[in-house]
Amino acid sequence: KSLPAPVVKLGTINFTGEISGFFDNLVAFGKLSSSIGSIQTDLIFGSNKDKNIAAYLRGRIASSNLQLHELFGENNPFGEARFDINIDTRRPVGGNFSGNIQAQVKEFDYKAYKYKDINLSGNFKKSSFDGTIHVNDPNGELYAQGIFQHQGQNSLFNFTARLDHFRPDRLNLTDKYEAPNISLALNADFTGDNIDNLEGSITLDSLSFETTPSSFFLKKFEVVASGHSLDRQLTITSDILN
């Protein structure tokens, strides 16, 4: 079976640097080079029986010149990427991996627009994840955070986001509107694991959509799902529809 095309386009991958230590404390410091650029690594793998840690991985992965567009076909929307990732994860004896990831995307090209300083962070366990993303761009600021916990019928999902002064025309995402400017707040809060037992709400707050020369404002739009089995209810509340 052939490898996926993006993997083939990586070409020959070389590692230059140093791998040293013992199996319970192995250090990989160096550079991975491929046809699309290089990634610097400063990682420690190991275990600590005294602290009941079966395995751990921590360290840093970074790149200053990754040519993502070369992985895909012609006219793909990607360009270059620069990033810095820190990871700290461990697995206790008889347990599962958990840890934390912090990432700063210093530059990321998409549709010929260069995004800068995208910050992401996340904590993960076997059945849960929580994280945040912050994009502070002159043509739109986004802050979002969310948590997901898988617990069968009691699974939990909570997501909040705030988008301010989003200019999709300047980001080369659309040319259908003249000088569009979008702001909104979103909250989703649910429990359940399928459409039959899902309970919670989605709330869209203070949606502002301005163009030249018109504008639209929606103070609130909320959808609430409640009840079980045959007693399901769906309630919609908004400025324009109830």
Regions found by a protein language model. Name each.
Residues 1-242:
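Interface amphipathic segments
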